[in-house]
Curated annotation (Swiss-Prot):
Domain of life, per lineage: Bacteria
Name of the protein described by the UniProt record: Large ribosomal subunit protein bL12
Matching InterPro entries: Ribosomal_bL12, Ribosomal_bL12_C, Ribosomal_bL12_C/ClpS-like, Ribosomal_bL12_oligo, Ribosomal_bL12_oligo_N_sf
Encoding gene per record: rplL
CDD domains hit by this protein: Ribosomal_L7_L12
Lineage: Bacteria, Pseudomonadati, Pseudomonadota, Gammaproteobacteria, Enterobacterales
SUPFAM superfamilies, A to Z: ClpS-like, Ribosomal protein L7/12, oligomerisation (N-terminal) domain
Pfam families (alphabetical): Ribosomal_L12, Ribosomal_L12_N
Source organism: Shigella sonnei (strain Ss046)
GO biological process, one term: translation
GO cellular component, one term: cytosolic large ribosomal subunit
Amino acid sequence: MSITKDQIIEAVAAMSVMDVVELISAMEEKFGVSAAAAVAVAAGPVEAAEEKTEFDVILKAAGANKVAVIKAVRGATGLGLKEAKDLVESAPAALKEGVSKDDAEALKKSLEEAGAEVEVK
């Protein structure tokens, strides 16, 4: 009769911490492995999160002072009055795409000062 995995798990669960430590040591000796190495291999190499370099500036809402927002959009995008007005009225809309973080933050600040609700993605 062979022992199932569930029976092994139940047996280990019933052991004290010291018994489990002794079991691990015995398994390391028997199979010539190290539990610490297995944990490191299982975790894998940790890669640093790649920092985003391009951002999109999204106008979510014009706010109460639509005229000031239209002026700010015109200044930032170089659009004509009608195009800027249409863009502001069609919010949420992308104002600029693929800009640097500094440019995106500066644009966001100027639009928020004009009263707009802006998101940088």
